[in-house]
Structures are given as structure tokens and as C-alpha cells.
Amino acid sequence: VYKRQTQEEVAAIEDSVDCTTAAGVRNYAILLLLSRYGIRSRDIAALSFENLDFENDRIHFIQQKTGDLWEMELFPEVKAALQDYILTARPKIQNCQNVFLTTMIPYKPLDSYAINTAVGIMVAKSDVNIAEKRHGSRAFRSSIASNMVNDKVSTEVVRKVLGHGTKHAIRHYARMDIENMRLCPLPTPKPSGIFSEMLSWKEDDHLV
């Protein structure tokens, strides 16, 4: 069973990103979309300018997996990272609405594989120990879900943030809430019936 990344580890990965390069600025914006919202990599790849409302601080899109609308507040740090990328690092090409592009000619939109590759590189370059832990884009989705569960955020809020259609879809995140589970261990039931007799068996009573 893979362990989730802690909030401290996620912060360490974010801090380790080299934002002095165009790729670093782009990847940092991608990383914040993952760590703050848990957006699926395919939806990040498909993100377009019409999905970003900088004036009203909103981000919205139709999820490719479910076909449902996903909409959230555009957090200040995410807004700043996106604007930094768009204004200073994104290639200036026409007739392309996709936000995230490759850094080399011919410029083209990133796909989900490229998103996952970029995330893997960022994690690998950080000092975070990823042994026995997920470390792709899905790892951040699992981490944000588990951290919300640990913080006792309602399942309805977790469901909306992750863009799940039903409450049942987040059950496996609740199973990952090891910290809280350890605080409420189940009591050992008192033995009864034949099981009780077996436990009280004495060798001297059964000698022939």
C-alpha cells in the first residue's frame, strides 16, 4: 500500500521548483493546480484561457472523465503562478487556446503524459523521500483528499473539490486516513462459546 505525501512534503516539492526557466515557471503553475485542487492531469492538459476568469478569481471547466462542470475559487498563489507563466514564459503563438504548451519548437499543447512526466521530474529533483509513496500527478490528488479527510472536512466538500460524481467514489481516501484510525482502535471482543472454552483449556484436565 502506497503512503500519501504529507502537507510538509508537498510544500517541500513546491519550494524546490526552479522558476528561473520557462519550463520551471510552467511546471510550477501545473504543480499548484495539482496540489491545491487535485485536478486530473488530462483536465490540466485541456485547460484553456476561457476556463480562467482572472477578473472574478474563478477557474472552471468540464471534466473529461465525468462530463460534469468543475468550478472553484482561483486561489491567489495559483492565480499568480498562472499569470506569471502566461505573461513571461508561455510561447507567443496564435490560434491556440490551451494554456500549457511545450517549451520547444514546434510549440504544441501538453498532453496528460507530458504533465505526468513534468511532475515526476519535479518530485525527483526535490529532497522528498518518495520511497513507498506515489509520486505522479495522481499522488497529489490522493494527498489533497487524504489531508482533507484528516482535517475532518466533510465528504461532500471533498467530493466537490475532487470532482467526483458520487460520495462513494471517495471511500478509498477515507481508508487512507491512518492517523485518525489509530486514535480510535476497535475494542477486542470478549470470547464466548466454544472459543472461550478453547482459551481456558488446561493440559492437566485432559490427561488420560
Q: In which residue ranges do the predicted regions lie?
A:
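Catalytic-site neighborhood detector that most strongly recognizes the C-terminal catalytic loop/helix
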Residues: 63, 162-187
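C-terminal catalytic core of Y-nucleophile DNA break-rejoin enzymes
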Residues: 66-83, 98-120
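C-terminal secondary-structure termini that scaffold catalytic or DNA-interacting sites
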Residues: 188-208
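Short, small-residue-biased leader/transition segments that mark boundaries at the very start
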Residues: 1-2
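Basic, Lys/Arg- and aromatic-enriched nucleic-acid-binding interface segment
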Residues: 12-41, 65
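Short, basic (Lys/Arg/His-rich) helix/loop patches that form interaction surfaces
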Residues: 18-19, 117-160
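The alpha-helix within a helix-turn-helix
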Residues: 34, 45, 159
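Conserved tyrosine-mediated DNA breakage-rejoining catalytic core shared by Y-recombinases
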Residues: 37, 41-42, 46-80, 168
